[in-house]
Amino acid sequence: MSNFKQKKITTKNGKEYTLQHPGVRTVAKINDRVKNKHGIPSEEKVCDEMFAHVVVEPKVKIEDFESYIDMMEVANKAYYFITGVDDPDKDKTDGNDQ
């Protein structure tokens, strides 16, 4: 991906985040890193990878979230964004692509 695409999202609780696509090769590497020996993605690893490589503003880590639901909402939206999967929760709270 020559121009790393960004997207602004707004969570259900009103917090705004900027996501940035890290490139196709990095997405493939992330997908490999987050799986356990049985090929099942680890929630903790997915969150760590999304927060390290995709959520660019504000920079966050797992410990910054007060609720599991809020943390997973951001991580899931980031994962949907980089993999090109439609967000099943997509509604008027999502920002527009930039």
Roles of regions detected by a PLM:
Residues 4, 20-98:
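Short, surface-exposed, charged amphipathic helix/loop patches that serve as local interaction elements
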